Each structure stands twice: as C-alpha cells, then as structure tokens.
Amino acid sequence: MKKYIAYAILSGLLLTAGWPSHGFPLLLFIGFVPLMLTEHQITQRAEFKKKGSKIFGLSFLAFFIWNAIVIWWLHYAQETDANGDLHNSWSAYLIPVVANSLFMSIVFQLYHFVKTKAGNLYGLVFLPAIWMSFDKLTLNWELTWPWFNLGNGFAKYYEWVQWYEYTGTFGGALWIWLVNITVFYYLTAYINKKEMRYLNKLGIYAGLLIAVPIGISYIIYANYEEKGKALDVLVLQPDLDPYNEKYMKDGLQIYEELKQLALKNIQPKTQFVVAPETAVPGSSALIFDNMYDDLIIQDIQQWTKTKKDLHFVTGASIMRIYPMQSLASETASVMRDGITWYDAYNSALQISGNDSIEVYHKSKLVPGVEIFPYRNILMPIIGEFMLNFGGTTKTLGIQPHRSVFKNKTNNATVAPVICYESIYGDYTTEYVREGANVIFTMTNDSWWGSTDGHRQLLLYGNLRAIENRRAIVRSANSGISAFVNQRGDIMKSLPYGEQGALNGTILMNSELTFYTKYGDVIARIALLVMGIILAYTLAQKLLYKQNKKKI
C-alpha cells in the first residue's frame, strides 16, 4: 500500500509542477499516470478489500496536494476577527481546496466504476469525457471554480496552444488526457513485458501526440497577422490597499487621485481611459436610478468633454433601490429598516461627454464572496457558518445576457469583462458575438498580495485573446495591468504593487474565430460520450443483477 500512496503523492506533485505560473506544462502529460496505474493495479489485486474506498482515498490525496499547493495564495485573503483585527483567512483557502479535491475524487471514482463494470476500453474513453464534463460543470453552476480546468495549464506557454481559436481550453484538456492515456498504456505494456516493437510504437505515438500540436501551434503563431484599425488606450493602476485604504478612504479623494493620474498621462491621441474594478465611487456605491446626478459622474463627463474622442471605462459599485419587496429582484436584499430592498452590483461603466452612460453588471460571481450558492437550499444549513467565517449570505445582482459598450465617435465595441469573468472562455465569446472587437478587463487582484493569485488570473485571462483573436486591455488595481495582442503576447505591462499609468495601441479585430462562433464543442461531445457510456454501464450492471437472480 505504501507504493500506491507514493504514486498518489507523485501524481499530485507532477500536476502541481506542471501548473502556471511557475510550472512546466510538459509534466501535465504524465501527471495522471501514477494515479491511473494505482487504480489499475489495485483493481487487479484479489487480496485487496474495499478497493473503491482505497482508490477514492488515494485519488483524494493526489488532488488535495495539487489543489493545496497551486492555490496556497488564497489564505492570504484577510478576514476580520471578533476584535476587528485582520488576519489570514484559512477558511477561504481550505473550503475550495477540500471541496474541489472531493469533486475530482468523485470523478475519478466514477471512472473506476465504469472501468470495473464495462471494461478497460470503456473506462479509458470515459475518463477524459467525464473529466471534461466536470470542467464544463465548474464553468456553469453556482459553485463555479474553474481554476483547475485542465486547458488553463498551458496559459503561460500560450505559444503551444494557438489552436485554441478552434477548440478553446477543452482542446488542451483533451490533449492532456490523450497523452496521459497513451503513456499509461505504454507503462502497463512494459510491466506486462510486451514486445519491444509494440512499446516503440506507443512511445513514438506519445511523442507525436505532444510534438505535432505544438508544431502546428508555432506555425499558426508565426504566421498570424493582427487585424483591424488602431485604438489608443490609457490604462490606470491606482494601487489602493483593498483592506486599509480602498474602502476606508473618502470616495471623493480616491476619485480625485484617479482623475489626476489620468489627466497627467492622457496623450493627444488617447481615445479610451480604463480604470480597474470598482474604481468609482470609492468606499460607497452609485445609485443606479440617479447616476446622472452623481457629482463624480458629472465631473467625469466634464473632463472627457475636453477631448472629442475620449471615453472613460471603469469598474463601479452600483446600488439599485426598490421601495417595496414586490418590486425587488430575486437577488435583492432588505435594508435594516426592513422595508426598503436593494440590489448591489459589481459593474462597469462607459462615460463620455458626448454619449449616454453605458452600464454592464458582472454576472460570473465569486462563490462565498459575491454570491451565496444555491441560497434557497443552503442558507438554512450553512448560512451562520458562512457569516462566522467571513463569507456572505447575500448575492450581487447580475444581468442575463452579455452586453457591449459602443460609442458615436470611433469603431470600438468594448467587451467589459470584470475580474473573475476573464477565466470563462465560452462566456467571453458571448460579448464577441454581440460585436465586441476589443476586450477591456477590469480587475482588483490585490486581496492576496504579491502571490501567484494575480499572476494566474492574468495568464488565464490572456487565453481569451487567442480564443477570440481579440486584443485585451487590462486594468488592475495593484497590477498586473497590461496590453495583450491578438496572439496572447503581453506587449506592455505595469509591475504588481506600483501606482502608474500605461499608454498603448491595440488593433480592433471584427472577424469571428471558429471557437467564437461555436464555443465549447469538445465539452458538449464529452458530455454526450460520458452520458452514453455511463448509461451503458448502468444497464450492464442491471442486466447482470437480473441474470444473477434468475440463476
């Protein structure tokens, strides 16, 4: 059993060592192999009892190691204790680590079930299918946590996956699984002392499986020419401490400092100024129905008027008031007076002196922070627990469809992507299908300090440039703010933890990629294959039981 524990630990460490931002993704091609060998050998050993429990425990160990190390930075989020002092939030770290490890272990357990009942071939087809189905689930349910979607593993080595414009990140996930399964076949054949000719064929096949997609990608990368007209943008990075400054400092003072940062760096050709997530109005919120009367909004309209073709795009905190519950939305909460209801939004605004204000509400929300998942079901069960550990029992308002920012003075159609939304591939294509020819990402990654958190989010988000062939302008509160071209290259950036501004020029592409048009085709096929094989396996088991009863 010690050997299998070592195998599980090895799998966890290989997956970790292959993951961004410091890992080398070649290791992802063998990361699952030790765990697959463990499952295979335990299944074959007659002396082992409770094989399913052993495999579940070992897979949990592997996935726990992977999750725990990769998102170690999460515990640097701060929460307030009973005395009002800030300290590291271990609950914000342990809950996703344990939950995601558990979900992954259940997926692997289902693979073991199918492989045992339906045979090796069905099992090895089922494994990538159910894993990608789980990855798709993590993108769409309220417990959404797609940080470990396998295709993200190539985010730093994006030159390897330029074909994401056809497949999205699920192409990367399928690639990883095909190589892992081939290497698994090779090792089992070697252990079973198969002919050298057979082993050589498998080895060559595994090598080609890795080399050919990388070669194709580099050809695409070298030959891709950016498309579209030029757009000149100024990015702001105010670098406000989210715990001791951003929500404690006077909102007008925060805005004035942001304004001065913009005015000092605007150039004659600047067409857009982009500020980060919730940059205005500071520590309070704009009232949705009275936005045009807000002093900050009016001032922005005044200084953007000084230049004909100037637009200010920023993240904003917005509140919508409902005088009675009958008018409130499903996500609304009641104020302390017990009468007035309101929705809070994490939003983006486009403001200029010549156009009406464009508004977009963030709609992929962070579980436990911006949304209480499945509130009607879980609130009575764990509501108090969430409050005690610094979470929320409320949910921010959202909008049902993606919308884009247009203007009257240039051809830019902006996809306003807010923070967490930037890691959702199929979701981002909705903006582009609405006409977006450039992506503006507004984010505040300061909650975890100078850790891998903000670097991983930057790298994941840059994959959207490849999938849609859209340039990205990224404004982050403390960094990393950047300009990313249509190939996924970071052209310019501001380091983390520095206040500053960055001028850059991007191109506005209006052509649609295959992935933009059709989305996660591979994931949909995986769902179908998973469903068919699982149904077949259950039917086989049922028939076996019925035949056994007859005997």
Question: Can you name each region flagged by the protein language model?
Answer:
Residues 1-221, 450, 461-464, 476, ...:
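Membrane-embedded alpha-helical bundles of multi-pass enzymes
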Residues 218-371, 404-411, 416, 420:
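Soluble catalytic regions of membrane-associated enzymes that act on cell-envelope
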Residues 100, 128-129, 272, 278-280, ...:
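CN hydrolase (nitrilase-like) catalytic-core segments centered on the catalytic cysteine
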Residues 16-19, 109, 235, 348-350, ...:
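Conserved hydrophobic/aromatic beta-strand scaffold that supports enzyme active sites
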Residues 21, 158, 228, 307, ...:
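A generic fold-level signal
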Residues 338-362, 480-496, 500-506:
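Amphipathic beta-strand/beta-sheet edge segments enriched in Tyr/Trp
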Residues 73-95, 118, 137-169, 333-420, ...:
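Active-site catalytic loop in hydrolytic enzyme cores
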Residues 21-36, 66-77, 237-238, 269-287, ...:
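Short, conserved active-site loops that position catalytic residues or coordinate cofactors/metal ions
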